[in-house]
Amino acid sequence: MKKILLVFVCSLFAFETVLAQEKNAVGLRLGDGVEFLYQCDLSSRNFLQFTLATPHFEGLSVTGIYNWRCCRWNWTPQTCDWYLNVGVGGALGLYDFDDSGFLLGVAGSCAFGCHFKNAPISLEVDYRPVVGAVIGGGHDGFFDPGFWNFGLSVKFHF
């Protein structure tokens, strides 16, 4: 377990070092585990989001989601801009460190949040289901726990 944790931490730093050269966002998501995320703007209407996660604290997965910025509201013009983003993508990873099952699935995203005007920070409440198959390690079958993936995110934009 210590070796896996060390590999995870080293991978995280390497992942963030490579991606930090872009001028977009990095963040942390708490929900169905812990996720480190990177957001890469493609245009003013869409972006890619990549996460490195520990689903159910039982494995390690990578998710990529193509998102659309579908709605914007100016409910609190002095403090923040409110938004709704939706997206679709895929996930793969290891499920259950002890038995090494492989996870392959489809991911979705629906995020409601606010981007603060006076600080490069945004907060989100989201639903990000991952539905697919777990193969090997005695866990062959449908990955249904990923269907209940609600979370809170904080992002730092740069």
For each feature predicted by the language model, list its residue ranges.
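Positively charged n-region of N-terminal signal peptides that target proteins for export
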Residues: 1-4, 20
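Sec-dependent N-terminal signal peptides
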Residues: 4-15
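Outer-membrane beta-barrel architecture
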Residues: 9, 37-39, 65-67, 109-111, ...
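Sec/Tat signal peptide C-region and signal peptidase I cleavage site
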Residues: 15-21
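Residues that define the transmembrane beta-barrel architecture of outer-membrane proteins
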Residues: 22-24, 30-34, 58-62, 82, ...
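Extracellular loop and loop/strand-boundary signature of outer-membrane beta-barrel proteins
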Residues: 23, 96-98, 136-141
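Gram-negative (and chloroplast) outer-membrane scaffold detector with strong preference
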Residues: 42-127
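Predominantly the C-terminal beta-signal and adjacent terminal strand-loop region
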Residues: 117-158
